[in-house]
Amino acid sequence: MAKKLPPMHPGEVLREEFLVPLSLSAGALAKVCGVPRTRIERIANEETAITTDTALRLSKALNTSAQLWLNLQNAYDVRTAELGIGRELDKIKPIVTAA
């Protein structure tokens, strides 16, 4: 079985696909979004999650969709949880089988 890649935090995408290439500081993006600078810094540093509010603001400022940011966060959360409880999940037997 192939090893799964570690989860990618949405802050990595924000940092590597937007902040760095656009030479945009966290403070400048925060100002456009109308949020505290620390919120963008903590996301970009992979220290906090992207909320629905932040996703909506990022989508407007960066011309993306809110769903992009929420999907990235959801994928990160699910993968992180899988890593945390993977052995417990392996013990669960399905009670419904696929048709």
Question: What are these language model-derived features?
Answer:
Residues 70-99:
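Short, charged recognition helix plus adjacent turn
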Residues 23, 46-47, 63:
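Alpha-helical hinge/cap motifs
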Residues 36, 47, 73-76:
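The DNA-recognition helices of helix-turn-helix-type DNA-binding domains
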Residues 1-24:
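A short, Lys/Arg-rich alpha-helix, primarily the initiator
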Residues 47-60:
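Short, basic-rich loop-to-helix N-cap that marks the start of a DNA-contacting helix
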Residues 23-42:
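Short alpha-helical DNA-recognition segment
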Residues 20, 31, 60:
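Alpha-helical residues within the helix-turn-helix
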